[in-house]
């Protein structure tokens, strides 16, 4: 029952097996009862197609050579189609097709019938569908009859290419001179099928109003009982929904808050919900809430739940990034360049092979390294033929990066305090082909005692790890305030030690980079601000064109304004581990004197020794306090007189000259120790040296040690009444003075300005002569620890004098 095949004819429409045999409609007429036009039964798809074809025939008649009066005979119309409907089609055009009694659906265009006509004309066959009384109809009678529903389903399968039928319909309408838009046709169908007063649009409006009411309903904090239930057995979906609601309320707190609720209540509820949903401890979550805004805080917590992408750094000592990328792609690795800021980085999305065990990795062509750990080396910018220190080098990623930037020239000293981690450094440096590195194992805080004078120093200080939570989720709960402060104190010590290791006079360097993988202010800005106060360094730009600026003010703290040049990196904004980078420039190798000796975290080196700077005490204290101090020291002199007597006996000084010893300052152990503790205190009473005056109080307090000659001498030379009788500061000679020998007497008493050199007559050493010799103007004098000494004449001018029967050398 197939049709003839013409190989030159292009096939159109569905296949020939999808069409039904012609003439089935005539058989249906025999089985179906006749119905009137008012109550017409729904036509089959085939009958509708033929009816539409006949209606369109009258429209297309003028363009064809057919007679315009040719109309289908009324007697041959199928049942269900009236002659009036067919006649109106030629008068009103295609719009009458929609007004014909066709049931609920508009008849499809006669695209398939046109194809059937063309096929029948080519095959020379008679279209039995147009002949209702054909003799072949008896041969095609179905024993079981035909069901219109089954015909509709089969015809639907034959009309799958809807676009093709619509295109043909538009072509026919254009040929008839009528232009119809698809929107107008659809609107007419909707008007026929659903009236404007029907229910579905009202239902949609009702749904929309309900949705608006749900959106406008304010959020209400749950009661205490529900909060306790969430703490015991939390419903994560409900907790997450509550987090979103609270964050939305806090953005517009004045308009959306619940009456009688304060902002602190919402914040406390949010903090508890975040701790439950993301499994954070209260301490660390509180630190993060102080650090980020609420909307950014949720993004940061979400980013910590996702691991950072795997990144690797190309070893330019052995290969190029282009060659390495091609080799890894051939092995099934999906990768891309890391970014415009890196010339050697690659980011790996997925891999069919272990990325850490490829032949390229074993050959040292690349190093698995995080993107954030490449930034400190780029900020340091090491140059060729320099001396560089990596104070905390393990596991060797930054050290090898510096070596490849230096092209294996110069010297790199890689130091780490952990001997076990140094093993990985050795392995990586050998694999990557680094040859300019020396590995050391010292405590970084004591490193300036070992070696110094480096051009550049890199300090990747140990920290709490709050920036790498995605790698170590245990940080969420095992950190507290003590851990943060302990790390901060260690970082201060290491940073001062690193600064002392830098050579400020370096022609190409003098730079230091300090970095941590933490985001807390206590470990970053606080430490940097401390170093700016303790050492002669300043902050310089890091050279990185991205990253957020460091804090210059955080809560109650205020930092140096130059901290804006530091850089912060976060996982939710830069898709890398949290990191902090600061770059210093050292401009002097000296240490500020104001910070010397009283720094708790200063590195104990030889440059930290205190310097003794003499300064007059009377310039800073009133005269009354000076007199009181002098009297107190006179009482001490009383108890130390036996030492004075032994000193006189050792140095051959007569008892008559005992009073002159009161004008000589001595440095005791207490005074020496105080000078090292506070350099602002003077070493001795300078004013007492300039104006030595002795009153009768000394003779009354120590009568046993004074001879009768001394008493008479003091009475004769006592100053008149009314003059200044201030007692100078008198201290007993120390043990060091007592051990001095007479041969040291040739050294001068002190290089004070205005000291007159006079020769004394050949007589015993008297008090008046000594006072006249040491009558110096007021002014600061350096401390002295020597006994009575003056300028010594040449040996030829030495004279002898008798004192109590003993020969003694007099100083002229």
UniProtKB/Swiss-Prot annotation:
Where, by residue number, does S-adenosyl-L-methionine bind? Answer: 392-398, 416, 443, 460
* A Gene Ontology molecular function term of the record: rRNA (cytosine-C5-)-methyltransferase activity
Compositional bias, Basic residues, is annotated for 43-56
EC numbers for this chain: 2.1.1.-
Feature: compositional bias, Basic and acidic residues: 1-13
**Cellular localisation:** Nucleus, Nucleolus; Nucleus
InterPro entries linked: MeTrfase_RsmB-F_NOP2_cat (IPR049560), MeTrfase_RsmB-F_NOP2_dom (IPR001678), NOP2_rpt (IPR012586), Nop2p (IPR011023), RCMT (IPR023267), RCMT_NOP2 (IPR023273), RsmB-like_ferredoxin (IPR054728), RsmB/NOL1/NOP2-like_CS (IPR018314)
Q: Where is this motif: Nucleolar localization signal?
A: 40-57
Quote the catalytic residue positions.
Answer: 517
Residues that the record marks as modified (Phosphoserine) are 36, 58, 67, 181, 666, 675, 732, 734, 786, 801, 812
- Record's superkingdom? Eukaryota
Cross-link for Glycyl lysine isopeptide (Lys-Gly) (interchain with G-Cter in SUMO2), residue positions: 71, 272, 615
Region (Disordered) residue ranges read 1-211, 591-812
Region labeled Interaction with NPM1 — which residues?
24-56
Q: Which UniProt keywords apply?
A: Acetylation, Citrullination, Isopeptide bond, Methyltransferase, Nucleus, Phosphoprotein, Ribosome biogenesis, RNA-binding, rRNA processing, S-adenosyl-L-methionine, Transferase, Ubl conjugation
What are the boundaries of the region N-terminal domain?
A: 1-370
Q: How does it assemble?
A: Interacts with MCRS1. Interacts with WDR46. Interacts with RRP1B. Interacts with NPM1. Interacts with NOP56, FBL, RUVBL1 and NUFIP1.
Q: What is this protein called?
A: 28S rRNA (cytosine(4447)-C(5))-methyltransferase
